[in-house]
Curated annotation (Swiss-Prot):
UniProt KW Protein transport keyword: no
Chain positions of motif NPA 1: 83-85
PROSITE patterns: MIP (PS00221)
Annotated organism of origin: Oryza sativa subsp. japonica
Induction record: Circadian-regulation. Expression is higher during the light phase than during the dark phase.
Disulfide bonds listed in the record: none
Molecular function in Gene Ontology: water channel activity
Annotated gene: TIP2-1
Protein name: Probable aquaporin TIP2-1
Subcellular location(s) of the protein: Vacuole membrane
Primary subcellular site in the record, as a coarse category: membrane
Gene3D superfamilies in alphabetical order: Glycerol uptake facilitator protein
NCBIfam families: MIP (TIGR00861)
Amino acid sequence: MVKLAFGSLGDSFSATSVKAYVAEFIATLLFVFAGVGSAIAYGQLTNGGALDPAGLVAIAIAHALALFVGVSVAANISGGHLNPAVTFGLAVGGHITILTGLFYWIAQLLGASIACLLLKFVTHGKAIPTHGVAGISELEGVVMEIVITFALVYTVYATAADPKKGSLGTIAPIAIGFIVGANILAAGPFSGGSMNPARSFGPAVAAGNFAGNWVYWVGPLIGGGLAGLVYGDVFIGSYQPVADQDYA
């Protein structure tokens, strides 16, 4: 059962919430800068060569490490979402209000966009790689993104949002980084392995190319929402909203 709550302006503009937005902006910027930067660096080292297995592994590791750090540094302030699909999945489960979630989205999208614009500047105008499907249709890309984003948000629920997580919560950032790295290895050659609308939106802004960008909104949001429904209803059970300061 969907547990969406709209929220109030008072809560969404409280000092705690504003700090959370700033934390999401900074952490998303750092994550996207390292993630997209690793792809640009690969292109520089190979003179624009096609992605090979070693390059895929390197980029997956860079994303995993950057997300591990990004979630860690923001976790105590904002919950460490860094991803509109994670925010949406948590909203579906009643862990963040719609209004506060929208401001999370704005912070995440701004952070990702500025990260990519900075990369374009510091690399002397090098092309910013954007996500796009390869060897599959856009519909197949959507399904791929649904599956891998479901895995990501399910992991977030199991290690960070579940009230019974106990000491498991201490490994949440590394578990989240691991699932993202693994999913990039699996989906990178096909859909790009985004799992994150902000991670795809930032490069699209910097490159001025939004072709196929809808895939990386539709797929991740469906996958994240499904994970929120499944874990929230089947495993967490009764609706017990978490206080705003914990996840918002």
